[in-house]
């Protein structure tokens, strides 16, 4: 089979930045609790893209065995997805049999033919009911998936790109009556996890969900052009953004680990730090002017507080005095 796409300068730059960030992480250092939290985020986001109404808190409660009020179908989707994510990363990403087994795990009790390729034609519709894509004819689906996996298994392409292409082609083939988006996203993560185990725990789906319209637009543009370049670029941007979010998340954890420092701060200092910390958890860095607006304090007072937080290791600073930016510390 032939997958149409072009290697662009944008792709090369994104791949370089992704590889650079990956060298800074070690899966062994990631706490088991954080891995579980990221997996729950992945599940909730991937299901939300498919219109599951449950919140992150509700999904967490379901997975932890607590009762939740919600549509039975949505609850069943969460239970299935958690089982699938727990088992799929030991599967062979180029095995059609494993692919069908993963679909069965995701959809049993929800569709008529879980774990089976569809037997009828299928269309994808936009919000106005207009057909935007028609999947492959059902009689061709098994052969197309087999050809795709055989190509991917033997391709020398870097898995970063290959995983995007497999994801794209699965969405175009649309092999199942339901669950195609979930399977495409999950299978990309599986391929990536064979390249770097960290990808088993990265909540890529959360970033896709945050840019859901961009995701659909990239699919539509690449489908119309019969060229996956735009979709590959989009997914590489998603992967990079996910890694950048993880970097911020790890800084927050490190600060939390150093929380014993806080009792040594005076009450007002602790209050200001909590304000700054909450801001940094959302935005990543803060300047003196932003800190003044946030706290309502004078420039000199803010500088004194920020300098103190740097001194005790709660914050780090970069840049000149005038344009200095502060972020959560890592000592």
Can you describe what each PLM-predicted range is?
Residues 1-331:
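FIC/Doc superfamily catalytic core
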């Amino acid at each position: 089979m032939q997958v149409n796409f072009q290697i662009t300068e944008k792709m090369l730059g994104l791949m370089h930045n992704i590889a650079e960030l990956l060298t800074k992480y070690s899966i062994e250092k990631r706490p088991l609790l954080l891995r579980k939290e990221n997996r729950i985020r992945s599940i909730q986001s991937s299901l939300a893209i498919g219109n599951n109404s449950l919140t992150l808190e509700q999904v967490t409660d379901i997975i932890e065995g607590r009762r939740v009020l919600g549509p039975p179908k949505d609850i069943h989707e969460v239970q299935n997805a958690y089982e699938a994510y727990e088992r799929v990363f030991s599967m062979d990403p180029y095995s059609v049999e494993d692919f069908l087994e993963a679909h069965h795990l995701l959809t049993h009790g929800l569709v008529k033919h879980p774990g089976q390729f569809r037997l009828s034609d299928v269309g994808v519709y936009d919000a106005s009911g207009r057909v935007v894509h028609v999947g492959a004819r059902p009689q061709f689906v098994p052969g197309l998936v087999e050809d795709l996996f055989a190509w991917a298994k033997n391709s020398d392409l870097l898995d970063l790109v290959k995983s995007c292409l497999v994801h794209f082609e699965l969405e175009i083939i649309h092999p199942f009556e339901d669950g195609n988006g979930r399977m495409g996203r999950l299978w990309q993560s599986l391929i990536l996890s064979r390249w770097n185990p960290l990808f088993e725990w990265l909540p890529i789906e959360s970033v896709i969900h945050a840019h859901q319209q961009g995701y659909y637009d990239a699919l539509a543009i690449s489908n119309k052009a019969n060229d996956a370049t735009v979709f590959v670029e989009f997914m590489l941007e998603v992967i990079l953004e996910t890694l950048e979010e993880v970097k911020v998340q790890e800084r927050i954890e490190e600060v939390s680990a150093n929380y014993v420092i806080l009792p040594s701060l005076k009450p007002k200092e602790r209050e200001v730090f909590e304000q700054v910390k909450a801001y940094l958890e959302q935005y990543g860095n803060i300047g003196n002017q932003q800190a003044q607006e946030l706290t309502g304090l004078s420039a000199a007072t803010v500088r004194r507080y920020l300098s103190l937080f740097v001194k005790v290791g709660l914050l780090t600073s970069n840049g000149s005095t005038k344009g200095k930016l502060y972020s959560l510390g890592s000592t």
